Amino acid sequence: MSLLVPVRTHQRHHPVVVELFVWEGTNDPTTEWPPLTRRNIHRLWQYARTLGGDDNVATAQRKLWRKANWLAFLEHVQRT
């Protein structure tokens, strides 16, 4: 599933296609994403950036898919 998300860069907003995948390492087919609200999408990008350690969204997104799992994201959302 693809979702077009506006991402703020240093100069202006750019639409970025975000591919939503089942998290790596998750074998449970019932695992679902939260509702795709603006707030949840924003939290997902914030979490990706904390894993990336920089403002490069593409790099952060790749690290997110590699390192994160669904429970880690849920814990992050509950803490914020």
Curated annotation (Swiss-Prot):
It comes from the Viruses. This is Protein Vpy. It comes from Bovine immunodeficiency virus (strain R29) (BIV).
